[in-house]
């Protein structure tokens, strides 16, 4: 079956959504060989993945993932990664700020692959538990408002793609679909995308898959999140409509900053800077990039009417130590891990 689909792709044809679903199932069942997996994703990358293909892959991934019952009022802040900018874990910092304001956050992530510090790495450095089971994650969401969903725990079938992904070394469709397959089945998200050419395809995909409000962001300085140092291209899916606009720090009440103040060399430095943001002692650029990304998340969650209002709420949460109090709450060993 996969040989037939590979041949079709090699001839320059695209896959239907159903065929893409079949292909991804072959990958996740262990039926596909490493060579077949590498060939498939390489062909798609060179030719350009279609919305049908992305949607088929995501549906297959969602059908095989372990899920948690998180309710309808949960949001995720994550990115495709691979921006190469060596910034601290901004989306993780934003998740803490957002959860301090009463919005439940199911933070989907992993360890570092190409970055200096993955979200799992920095949480461990901060002394925050990573729930060891879906049950523990659900409890963390209910008691603390934020749970980290460690991707390998929920996407065990993706282990078959690990070898080819590592050997290939370049970004493929697998980098795109991870954020679209949150185990909490979030309908509202902020997703950082490393290239604007993918943001519209991902928005179309999420519209097809039934998302309510998803904001895709790409900094023009290469960040896969809202930048404090440059304009950010935004593609917004809201209630079935897709719109595009450009976001600047100044347009939401912030001053433009410098990337140097938000860059780190290790997970230790990332954790230290994140904590400094929460207690208000970090450089202004680090505080503002956190408030900017948290503000977009508050807007996507429906907590704020506009991004500017969300940014103001987020910055206030940092300045009055609400976010720092949430960081301390997350550190407390109250969650009992499931088996």
From Swiss-Prot:
Mg(2+) 2 binds at residues 224-225. It catalyses: N-(5-phospho-beta-D-ribosyl)anthranilate + diphosphate = 5-phospho-alpha-D-ribose 1-diphosphate + anthranilate. Its EC number is 2.4.2.18. Gene3D superfamilies: Nucleoside phosphorylase/phosphoribosyltransferase catalytic domain (3.40.1030.10), Transferase, Pyrimidine Nucleoside Phosphorylase, Chain C (1.20.970.10). 5-phospho-alpha-D-ribose 1-diphosphate binds at residues 79, 82-83, 87, 89-92, 107-115, 119. One of its GO terms (biological process) is L-tryptophan biosynthetic process. It holds the Pfam family Glycos_transf_3. GO terms for cellular component: cytosol. Keywords: Amino-acid biosynthesis, Aromatic amino acid biosynthesis, Glycosyltransferase, Magnesium, Metal-binding, Transferase, Tryptophan biosynthesis. One of its GO terms (molecular function) is magnesium ion binding. Pathway: Amino-acid biosynthesis; L-tryptophan biosynthesis; L-tryptophan from chorismate: step 2/5. Signal peptide: none annotated. Homodimer. Belongs to the anthranilate phosphoribosyltransferase family. NCBIfam families: trpD. Catalyzes the transfer of the phosphoribosyl group of 5-phosphorylribose-1-pyrophosphate (PRPP) to anthranilate to yield N-(5'-phosphoribosyl)-anthranilate (PRA). This is Anthranilate phosphoribosyltransferase. It comes from Geobacillus stearothermophilus. The lineage of its organism: Bacteria, Bacillati, Bacillota, Bacilli, Bacillales.
């Amino acid at each position: 079956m996969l040989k037939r689909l590979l041949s079709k792709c090699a001839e320059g044809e695209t896959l239907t959504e159903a065929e893409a679903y079949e292909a991804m199932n072959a990958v996740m069942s262990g039926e596909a060989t490493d060579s077949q997996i590498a060939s498939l994703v390489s062909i798609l990358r060179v030719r350009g993945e279609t919305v049908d293909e992305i949607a088929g892959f995501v549906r297959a991934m969602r059908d095989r993932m372990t899920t948690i019952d998180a309710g309808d009022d949960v949001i995720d802040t994550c990115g495709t990664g691979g921006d190469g900018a060596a910034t601290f874990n901004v989306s993780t910092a934003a998740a803490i700020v957002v959860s301090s304001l009463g919005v439940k956050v199911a933070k989907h992530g992993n360890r570092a692959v190409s970055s200096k510090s993955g979200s799992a790495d920095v949480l461990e450095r901060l002394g925050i538990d990573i729930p060891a089971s879906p049950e523990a994650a659900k409890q963390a969401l209910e008691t603390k408002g934020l749970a980290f969903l460690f991707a390998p725990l929920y996407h065990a079938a993706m282990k078959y793609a690990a070898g080819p992904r590592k050997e290939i070394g370049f970004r493929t469709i697998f980098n795109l679909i991870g954020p679209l397959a949150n185990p909490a089945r979030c309908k509202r998200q902020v997703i950082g995308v490393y290239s604007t050419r993918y943001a519209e395809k991902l928005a179309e995909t999420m519209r097809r898959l039934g998302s309510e409000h998803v904001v895709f962001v790409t900094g023009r300085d290469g960040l896969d999140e809202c930048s404090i140092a440059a304009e950010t291209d935004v593609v917004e899916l809201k209630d079935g409509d897709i719109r595009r606009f450009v976001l600047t720090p100044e347009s939401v009440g912030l001053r433009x900053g410098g990337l140097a103040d938000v860059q780190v060399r290790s997970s230790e430095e990332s954790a230290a800077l994140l904590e400094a943001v929460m207690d208000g002692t970090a450089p202004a650029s680090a505080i503002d990039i956190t408030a900017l990304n948290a503000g977009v998340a508050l807007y996507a969650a429906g907590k704020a009417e506009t991004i500017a209002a969300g940014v103001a709420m987020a910055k206030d949460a940092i300045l009055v130590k609400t976010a720092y109090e949430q960081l301390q709450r997350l550190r407390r060993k109250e969650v009992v891990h499931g088996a």
